[in-house]
């Protein structure tokens, strides 16, 4: 079974448990923290994969390191250690985030603009495009792209909505040339 499929199964199980206990946000925050630790300290995964330590010792280390985490996340990480799938942490966190966003009616969007957007502009874009894609709200990430000349380009999942000046000029050029 591919790593992606395994990660989705773990994420689905954790998501269903978190949903039953009404702790989607807490579990998501713990998974984000775990992902951050893994990214900032690759030695952490090396330690959890090291044959030098017994599985029980590794589980004990996880319990000590993540003492403040929700029991669901703690037990999931311990299970990953036991099943030798601790390298799946990032994929599981990403899959969980997708499931939680879908359940909460949110989506991630990247807005490309020639300058940083104000909070009000981000909120307006979120409201407008959330309705367009059938979501309650969008989590906006703003990226500066001077090549747009003006306007914005919004990417939500695989969809791109381009109302940049550069795109409008390109369309006009195509219409005039042929």
Curated annotation (Swiss-Prot):
<dbReference type="InterPro" id="IPR000711">
    <property type="entry name" value="ATPase_OSCP/dsu"/>
</dbReference>
<dbReference type="InterPro" id="IPR026015">
    <property type="entry name" value="ATP_synth_OSCP/delta_N_sf"/>
</dbReference>
<keyword id="KW-0813">Transport</keyword>
<dbReference type="Pfam" id="PF00213">
    <property type="entry name" value="OSCP"/>
</dbReference>
<dbReference type="GO" id="GO:0045259">
    <property type="term" value="C:proton-transporting ATP synthase complex"/>
</dbReference>
<keyword id="KW-0066">ATP synthesis</keyword>
<comment type="function">
    <text>This protein is part of the stalk that links CF(0) to CF(1). It either transmits conformational changes from CF(0) to CF(1) or is implicated in proton conduction.</text>
</comment>
<keyword id="KW-0375">Hydrogen ion transport</keyword>
<comment type="similarity">
    <text>Belongs to the ATPase delta chain family.</text>
</comment>
<comment type="function">
    <text>F(1)F(0) ATP synthase produces ATP from ADP in the presence of a proton or sodium gradient. F-type ATPases consist of two structural domains, F(1) containing the extramembraneous catalytic core and F(0) containing the membrane proton channel, linked together by a central stalk and a peripheral stalk. During catalysis, ATP synthesis in the catalytic domain of F(1) is coupled via a rotary mechanism of the central stalk subunits to proton translocation.</text>
</comment>
<keyword id="KW-0406">Ion transport</keyword>
<dbReference type="GO" id="GO:0046933">
    <property type="term" value="F:proton-transporting ATP synthase activity, rotational mechanism"/>
</dbReference>
<keyword id="KW-0139">CF(1)</keyword>
<comment type="subunit">
    <text>F-type ATPases have 2 components, F(1) - the catalytic core - and F(0) - the membrane proton channel. F(1) has five subunits: alpha(3), beta(3), gamma(1), delta(1), epsilon(1). F(0) has three main subunits: a(1), b(2) and c(10-14). The alpha and beta chains form an alternating ring which encloses part of the gamma chain. F(1) is attached to F(0) by a central stalk formed by the gamma and epsilon chains, while a peripheral stalk is formed by the delta and b chains.</text>
</comment>
<keyword id="KW-1003">Cell membrane</keyword>
<protein>
    <recommendedName>
        <fullName>ATP synthase subunit delta</fullName>
    </recommendedName>
</protein>
<keyword id="KW-0472">Membrane</keyword>
<dbReference type="InterPro" id="IPR020781">
    <property type="entry name" value="ATPase_OSCP/d_CS"/>
</dbReference>
<dbReference type="GO" id="GO:0005886">
    <property type="term" value="C:plasma membrane"/>
</dbReference>
